[in-house]
Amino acid sequence: MKNKIFIIIFASSLLAGCWNSGGHGDETYIVATDATLAPMSFMSVGNDMIGFEPDLIRAIADKAKINISLVNVEWAGLFGGLITKKFDMIISSVTVLEERKQRMGFSIPYLKSGLTLVVRKDEKKITSFEDAKNNNVLVGAQIGTTAYYFLEKESSIKTKGYQMYGHAISDLINGKIHAVLGESSGTLFLKNQPLFQEVKIVGEILSNEFYAVVLRKDENQLMTQINLAIKKLIADGTIAQLHKKWDLGQAAQVP
């Protein structure tokens, strides 16, 4: 039953996210993203997939002269779905990590970002990540993300995993955890949204992370096309324009 449900959702997403970049042959590459983190990738009120990364992958497709179809897939299913050929690429704020490179191929980076810590607005003891370490607090993070891995390495911090970043924020507001660690550009964008009126960002941006398009390791020709397209989009200022359009600010930089 789960497989049937996935196929129905997957097919619906294909219809919603098709992008024909014009005159680039018949083959269409399926690109997966977890559209739950504004402004990187999220669903509009009209149920369109929008954000920095949907715009970017469409620009990459134009430069690479390929056709793509965007699908919305939960984070937990991204890597397995790619490896089992349910789709051909991932663009979803995926950080380049050595352990991930053993299983998948990564393009050159299109963005540099980091991690930020969020606490309730009435929190007085935690003003930085060091404070969180020293106070032995419970910190939430989305499972399978670099924020979650980052916390796992800190023995002085108790970690609680979530399938979605927004669920962690809800638990924070309700006093079930003390803080949330997440991707900096999405966190800074959301700070002015209604859900974030009860929380605040503390401390500096943690870590240096590079985001890349993810492919299967054997897709050498496609990887070459994607890398060349990203280089052109960096050189002609397109990625910088998208950075400005989606108000990523100092939370993320173009390489």
Model-derived regions, located:
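Extracytoplasmic small-molecule ligand-binding "clamshell" domains
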Residues: 24-93, 102
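Flexible hinge/capping segments at coil-to-helix
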Residues: 120-137
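Ligand-binding clefts/hinges and TM-proximal coupling segments of bilobed small-molecule sensing domains
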Residues: 20-21, 146-162, 201-202, 230-255
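Periplasmic-binding protein-like
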Residues: 35, 112-119, 184, 188-231, ...
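C-terminal motif of bacterial Sec signal peptides marking the signal peptidase cleavage site
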Residues: 14-17
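A ligand-binding cleft/hinge motif common to bilobed small-molecule-binding domains
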Residues: 80, 92-102, 150-153, 173, ...
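Beta->alpha turn/N-cap motifs
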Residues: 32-37, 71-76, 85-97, 142-145, ...
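Short helix-initiation/N-cap motifs at beta->coil->alpha
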Residues: 54, 69-80, 127, 160-174, ...
